[in-house]
């Protein structure tokens, strides 16, 4: 399972890197999120292996969750883009702004997870809700870590 997730994440990163030179930031974000959403859903569907009796409720909540999470991912990409654009001239004000925006984005993602954990638990079970949160967090942390490795450190 880890190999499938790593390969999926790696392929997404390759498409991210090649698409940055081809279109505007918003077009790239839409392209990445639409292709990632399909791959991610397939991974989650295979991992969750939900019974037919609860699958429709789960996927309905999942769609709403993904819509909100995608907006947070879009903001994260904007923060990264701003960092890369301003990298050569980052001073105290720019660093402060980027740090505050990143912390706010992290907090909003935690709030989203908390709110949707309750919804998933109500529609399925605590076990299924925890299982979803675990795989979702794993997927996104894998991708975030791979992206972070490509970013330069401030003032280096």
Regions found by a protein language model. Give the residues of each.
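Active-site-adjacent substrate/metal-binding segments within catalytic domains
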Residues: 38
